[in-house]
C-alpha cells in the first residue's frame, strides 16, 4: 500500500512539524511544508529534512482566495491528499476548505471548546482552570470549531508557570498528533 502524501502548514517554530517528521511508522510522506512567514524557523527544519517548502506572503495577494488558490495548485501538483495544520496562524478560507473538504486537520493547545484562538495556554493559565488540554479536530470556517477527533487533558498544577504548562501541553501535542494522523490515514 502506498503512503498518503500530506502537507503540513506551519507559521512559526514547527515543533509539531518536527514531531510528525520524527514519528515512526506513519502511513504518509510529508511532501510539502506551507508557511506564511518567510523567516519562520520551521522552514529551516523542513529544508534540513529535504521537505519541499511553499512560502507565501499574504500581503503580496489582493485576497485570501488568491493565495489559497496558489496553495491548492501546489498541493494538487504534488498529489497531496491531506493537510495537517501545525501552528499555522491563519484562518483557512473557503478556497482550501472546498478543495480539501474533510481532509484538513488542526491541533489546538486547549481542551476545546475552551480557549479557542491564539495564546490558548496563556488564556487557560490566566483563567486559573484546573486542567487544559490538547484537541485534534477537523477544520471548518470557524476559529477552532470543527468536529473534534480526539482530546486529552493536561492538569494545571498550583506551582505551574506558563512555561511549565506549555512544556507539558507541547509534550502531549507531540505524542497525540502523530497518533491521530496514523489513525486517520489507516481508515
Placement of each model-derived feature along the sequence:
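Donor/substrate-binding cores of folate-linked one-carbon enzymes
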Residues: 23, 28, 36, 89-187
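Amphipathic, non-transmembrane alpha-helical secondary structure
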Residues: 18-22, 44, 69-76, 175-178, ...
Amino acid at each position: 500500500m502506498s503512503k498518503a502524501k500530506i502537507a503540513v502548514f506551519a507559521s512559526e517554530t514547527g515543533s509539531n512539524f518536527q514531531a510528525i517528521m520524527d514519528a515512526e511508522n506513519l502511513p504518509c510522506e510529508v511532501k510539502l511544508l506551507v508557511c506564511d512567514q518567510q523567516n519562520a524557523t520551521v522552514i529551516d527544519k523542513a529544508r534540513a529534512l529535504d521537505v519541499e517548502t511553499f512560502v507565501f506572503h499574504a500581503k503580496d495577494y489582493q485576497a485570501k482566495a488568491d493565495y489559497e488558490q496558489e496553495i491548492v495548485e501546489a498541493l494538487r501538483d504534488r498529489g497531496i491528499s491531506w493537510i495537517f495544520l501545525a501552528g499555522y496562524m491563519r484562518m483557512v478560507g473557503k478556497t482550501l476548505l472546498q478543495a480539501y473538504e474533510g481532509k484538513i486537520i488542526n491541533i489546538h493547545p486547549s481542551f476545546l471548546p475552551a480557549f479557542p484562538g491564539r495564546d490558548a495556554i496563556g488564556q487557560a493559565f490566566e483563567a486559573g482552570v484546573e486542567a487544559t488540554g490538547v484537541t485534534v479536530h477537523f477544520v471548518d470556517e470557524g476559529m477552532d470549531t470543527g468536529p473534534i477527533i480526539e482530546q486529552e487533558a493536561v492538569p494545571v498544577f498550583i506551582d505551574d508557570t506558563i512555561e511549565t504548562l506549555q512544556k507539558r501541553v507541547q509534550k502531549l501535542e507531540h505524542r497525540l498528533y502523530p497518533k491521530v494522523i496514523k489513525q486517520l490515514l489507516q481508515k
